[in-house]
Regions:
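Accessory recognition modules or surfaces
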Residues: 361, 373-375, 381, 385, ...
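Active-site-adjacent "subsite" loops/lids of carbohydrate-active enzymes
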Residues: 340-342, 347-354, 402-466
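Bacterial N-terminal signal peptides that target proteins for export
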Residues: 1-13
Length: 729
């Protein structure tokens, strides 16, 4: 047979084609202590002991390949990127580096993996073929950044006994993308190299474990080794008042107006005096004036009258929105003086005035047997004008915290009731985050502008100091900072990326503890902002359906959450609501939940619900939510007002009586284990570092467990050194 002859032009063409094509590199094998990693340099597909864990990307040209027994590196010339893989025990460290700005895709979920675990809030584990999760993730979580949208910068995948976890040691500038294809969720990951991160390396740790919490525990170990994890015990040692959080339920006290209807002792006299002042009546709406004319006003009419009266009081001495807490406290004192002079003989003693944060409410909490509470005020004016209540609450051992925020600045006069957004115009303009188009980044709700936390730090220090001094609070809830929300800021005066912005948020929060000695909480309590925080709200029940009109806008919808009215008990916080089946499954179904966050931070940050989603918001699943909180050993959160004490206080007492003794026993213990006891997730067990166990039966049927009968909707409590007991919901 004659040999194949190739003419010179054809040969040249073939050589050029071969050079242009990706250079196929043989798969690399790295042998760990018990695991064998197979890595394709051209696609970055990865298998562990012959199980594929990343399908990688389309093939890329490879050069400069070097390899050793425990590591290898190579170059992707077309992407101007360098790749390094290195064993760390049985973990694999993957490092990507690029000297030029670019987005670099590196991971895709292989088809053999059937379940994903992620911390959108506390933690979820779901099938990639579940129809509810296909809809929820596809519609609301299709694109996630890993420093903000994920509360832990990791995800796990499994298809059986072993769990494969991707832990982002570089949590910034990453994006996860979900797509839907063939009735299955597909997941991919990419990293952005830019001038904001100065092309710093992206490092991810791939770890293998035998249970669903393995990745979270490995992340905790890594944080501790890096000095980025701090125990509650250490935090309390620096600020002893923090110990008041042990066993404490969390309560928001609503209503910051000066007077409540229960402060009136002579209704006929009040009606007569108001009707004698035509100028005063101009502050009352038509409906309020009708109530004022009633012979014997019913409670609902009294509430209307008080709304008009409080508006009248505010109009007599307007609050200087731009002048800060000290000036505002002086105006609030003048209002009290004005009311005493004009109406004092018709009212109870001034010490007992008030709506949410008031002496009668504090006394009611004490008389109900509630010994440990965190009390928050949604507006700092309540704390400024209710000194008697603040002092009484702290004497009883409660924490009293005000809400504050430095995230958005609005123009003067645009919304004077939004006190935290009243940032001096010069600071608001100078510190506004600038988008790539050169325009300020719109603030919360599209109003004003979002602010760079580093730029506003001097102003924030000054105002927080004023607030602490003027109000006497011993706690502070600093909104947004704990979420790790960050973006690239193109403002030449303070240009920075996500990592620097989150560092600035942490610096602001750390200052509160170091200088003001306040017990600090914030929203979410993201892993990247956990170190300065003692508590946070938003992980146990996280926000969902933000764009769902049936929940947010359509008042006749059965799923409507409520209006932001009335001020003393806004419907959105107090009105019972139903859940759409999608959210009942994805956000609240115990079988779809996983204590990932608690496995990392149970003994570091106390975490509860988002204030829009308190324990009483959804009556249909009230028992399941309470039981899940006990299983995870996390505090309940309840919205309360003076007018809702009768209906809500017994619920708070029940929740607190069950939670407090468990938390007092377990607050400083790590959550180290979790398992289903029935195979379907209706009976679940958590295990703590001292050997204590909690077992929750979410079903309506009894089950025999280790020789013990566990009825439906009950919690089995097996604390170290104590007899086994049962709690009923």
């Amino acid at each position: 047979m004659k040999g194949l002859r190739i003419k010179a032009p054809v040969l040249g063409y073939l050589l050029i084609s071969l050079l242009a094509a990706p250079l196929a590199a043989a798969p690399l094998i790295l042998q760990g202590e018990t695991l064998s990693y197979r890595i394709a340099p051209d696609t970055l597909a990865i298998s562990i002991n012959k199980v594929q864990v990343s399908a990688g990307q389309p093939a890329r040209q490879v050069d400069k390949l070097t390899r050793g027994e425990q590591e290898a590196s190579w170059h992707w010339p077309a992407q101007d990127a360098r790749v390094e893989v290195k064993l760390d025990g049985d973990d694999l460290l993957l490092t990507l580096v690029s000297d030029t700005p670019r987005q670099l895709a590196w991971y895709s979920l292989p088809k053999n993996q059937t379940h994903l675990s992620m911390a959108f809030g506390e933690g979820s584990r779901f099938s990639v073929r579940d129809s509810d999760w296909l809809g929820y993730v596809g519609d609301e979580l299709a694109e996630l950044n890993t420093h903000y949208d994920l509360k832990l910068p990791l995800w796990s995948q499994d298809a059986g006994k072993q769990t494969y976890s991707w832990i982002l040691q570089t949590p910034y500038d990453n994006q996860l993308n979900f797509t839907r294809k063939g009735g299955r969720l597909q997941l991919s990951a990419r990293h952005e190299f830019s001038s904001f991160n100065q092309q710093a390396p992206m490092v991810v740790r791939l770890s293998v474990g035998d249970d669903w919490l393995a990745g979270a525990r490995r992340y905790r170990e890594w944080l501790q080794a890096e000095g980025e994890w701090q125990s509650l015990a250490d935090k309390f040692a620096r600020i002893p008042a923090g110990r008041r959080l042990i066993g404490a339920s969390h309560v928001y006290l609503w209503g910051d107006a000066l007077l409540d209807r229960q402060d009136v002792k002579d209704w006929p006299g009040l009606q007569a005096r108001l009707n004698q002042k035509p100028a005063w009546l101009q502050a009352f709406s038509g409906e309020e004036q009708e109530a004022l004319a009633a012979t014997a006003p019913e409670p609902w009419q009294q509430t209307l009258i008080m709304a008009g009266l409080n508006r009248l009081i505010a109009s007599q001495l307007p609050l200087p929105a731009q002048q800060g807490p000290v000036s505002q406290s002086k105006v609030l004192a003048l209002r009290q003086q004005w009311v005493r002079g004009q109406l004092g003989d018709l009212l109870v003693a001034q010490t007992r005035w008030g709506q949410g944060l008031s002496l009668p409410v504090i006394e009611a909490l004490q008389q109900a047997g509630l010994h440990k509470l965190w009390l928050g005020t949604p507006q700092w004016t309540a704390a400024l004008q209710q000194g008697y209540a603040v002092t009484a609450a702290q004497r009883l051992g409660y924490l009293v915290g005000s809400y504050d925020s430095y995230d958005t600045a609005i123009l003067p006069g645009s919304n004077d009731s939004w006190l935290t957004a009243q940032i001096p115009p010069k600071i608001g303009k100078r510190c506004a985050i600038m988008e790539a188009n050169g325009k300020p980044k719109p603030g919360f709700g599209g109003e004003g502008a979002y602010l760079n936390p580093g730029c506003t730090l001097p102003f924030a220090k000054s105002r927080m100091s004023e607030l602490a001094k003027a109000s006497g609070i011993n706690s502070l809830f600093l909104d947004v900072d704990g979420t790790a929300m960050a973006s690239n800021d193109y403002n030449p005066a303070h240009q920075q990326g996500s990592q620097a912005m989150i560092a600035a948020r942490n610096a602001r929060m750390a200052w509160v503890g170091e200088r003001l000695r306040l017990v600090l909480g914030s929203e979410d309590g993201n892993a990247l902002t956990s170190k300065p925080l003692m508590f946070a709200h938003g992980i146990q029940s996280w926000g969902f359906g933000w764009q769902d009109a049936s929940m947010r806008k359509q008042a006749k919808s059965p799923y409507y959450l409520g209006k932001w009215w009335p001020d003393e008990a806004p419907q959105v916080f107090f009105q019972p609501a139903r859940l759409k089946p999608r959210y009942l499954k994805t956000v609240f179904n115990p079988a779809d939940r996983l204590p990932l966050y608690q496995a990392v931070f149970h003994d570091s940050v106390l975490n509860s619900h988002h204030w829009l989603l308190d324990n009483l918001k959804f009556p249909g699943i009230k028992e399941e939510r309470a039981l899940l909180g006990l299983l995870y050993n996390t505090p309940p959160l309840v919205n309360l007002s003076r007018s809702t004490l009768e209906s809500r206080l017994p619920e708070l007492v029940r929740l607190s009586d069950q939670f407090a003794p468990l938390h007092e026993a377990l607050w400083d213990k790590a959550l180290v284990g979790f398992r289903w006891r029935d195979g379907v997730g209706r009976v679940q067990e958590t295990r703590f570092s001292d050997g204590s166990r909690l077992v929750a039966n979410f079903s309506n049927s009894s089950i025999m467990l280790d020789g013990q009968k566990l009825p439906g909707k009950h919690l089995l409590v097996a604390l170290k050194g104590k007899p086994v007991t049962l709690l009923t919901m």
